Amino acid sequence: MNVPARIKDLMIVNMGPQHPSMHGVLRLIVTLDGEDVVDCEPILGYLHRGMEKIAENRTIIQYLPYVTRWDYLATMFTEAITVNGPEQLGNIQVPKRASYIRVIMLELSRIASHLLWLGPFMADIGAQTPFFYIFRERELIYDLFEAATGMRMMHNYFRIGGVAADLPYGWIDKCFDFCNYFLTRVIEYQKLITRNPIFLERVEGVGVVGREEVLTWGLSGPMLRASGIQWDLRKVDNYECYDEFDWEVQWQKEGDSLARYLVRIGEMMESIKIIQQALEGIPGGPYENLEIRSFDREKEPEWNDFEYRFIGKKSSPTFELPKQELYVRVEAPKGELGIFLIGDHNGFPWRWKIRPPGFINLQILPQLVKRMKLADIMTILGSIDIIMGEVDR
């Protein structure tokens, strides 16, 4: 009988997929030498649902409700990328008012995502109080979403050529009130957290990623900007109408977990600046380009037959994707969210490839946790900010 050789005094531990610090169904096979991490192997795929294949069997309008299940904490960005691709393929113009509304919703969603990163991240490293504080502000954002879209999460608000509905009466004033209130809350977070000696002991110098490593691994978002690279797609690509607003790219040069925290705190402040400028300058006009809609009406049903009475009287809009290929991207809270889209003179995409920022950023985790302590795994993984619905798709 052959007895497999084993490394003496090493212990293999499974973290997840049920561990509360895994932020979803992530499993880590960790090899330990006492408290020191020798090796770490992430096991993905527990939340795989075949989102790319589903896209090839749905029209864009039919697929919109699915995309909100990728990153379910920042659903506006997955909706934006889903409509931006067909808009660019078909040269569809978005009304100015719709573009401003999109920017407001995207930045509110960015703040909500960063808040729900901050609370669990602080809980992972032992600070419970901020976990409860962030829900106070997050609920106000969800109230704004509910008033504008009808849903607190999974909004299904973006449409090809605009948005589903205009902003309701009084919504802009409510959003102004939230912006003024939220600035005071961010200052409270900074006083409570940033100079806390216990917090600094847990995050300073932990999970350092150098400038060259960031580029080699293809990292994006706060992971990239915390390592000294000022790269933000809102400035680089100027999609929607971000070039009309005055704001700064937030970045740090240390590349550790503290730097990633500071970048996200700064981004929330900048998002408020963008929202306030958009609210002040939002133009009138239509909220959707209805001219580009086409309807399949090959045969009108009789007024008294089964299809007319029970299946539905209203035909759904269809958009034919030209025979072209396109890569389109947006700056999501976690990094560069992109899709590679191939059209084929059909309402269905021939190929729909998703580039999730969380999946790319997660690849560097084994390198970061080696030679660190077991407790540092939670700090490093939390600072990366992943959502498994987006990672596994």
UniProtKB/Swiss-Prot annotation:
Molecular function via GO: NAD binding; oxidoreductase activity, acting on NAD(P)H, quinone or similar compound as acceptor; quinone binding
A Pfam family this chain is assigned to: Complex1_49kDa
One BP term from GO: photosynthesis, light reaction
Listed InterPro entries: NADH_Q_OxRdtase_suD (IPR001135), NADH_UbQ_OxRdtase_49kDa_CS (IPR014029), NDH1_su_D/H (IPR022885), NiFe-Hase_large (IPR029014)
PROSITE patterns noted in UniProt: COMPLEX1_49K
Main localisation: plastid
Localization per Swiss-Prot or TrEMBL: Plastid, Chloroplast thylakoid membrane
EC number: 7.1.1.-
Record has NAD as a keyword: yes
GO CC, alphabetical: chloroplast thylakoid membrane
Domain of life: Eukaryota
Keywords for the protein's UniProt record, in alphabetical order: Chloroplast, Membrane, NAD, NADP, Plastid, Plastoquinone, Quinone, Thylakoid, Translocase, Transport
Catalyzed reactions: a plastoquinone + NADH + (n+1) H(+)(in) = a plastoquinol + NAD(+) + n H(+)(out); a plastoquinone + NADPH + (n+1) H(+)(in) = a plastoquinol + NADP(+) + n H(+)(out)
Topology within the bilayer: Peripheral membrane protein
Record family assignment: Belongs to the complex I 49 kDa subunit family.
Quaternary data: NDH is composed of at least 16 different subunits, 5 of which are encoded in the nucleus.
Family annotation (HAMAP family): NDH1_NuoD
Function: NDH shuttles electrons from NAD(P)H:plastoquinone, via FMN and iron-sulfur (Fe-S) centers, to quinones in the photosynthetic chain and possibly in a chloroplast respiratory chain. The immediate electron acceptor for the enzyme in this species is believed to be plastoquinone. Couples the redox reaction to proton translocation, and thus conserves the redox energy in a proton gradient.
Name this polypeptide is given: NAD(P)H-quinone oxidoreductase subunit H, chloroplastic
Source lineage: Eukaryota, Viridiplantae, Streptophyta, Embryophyta, Tracheophyta
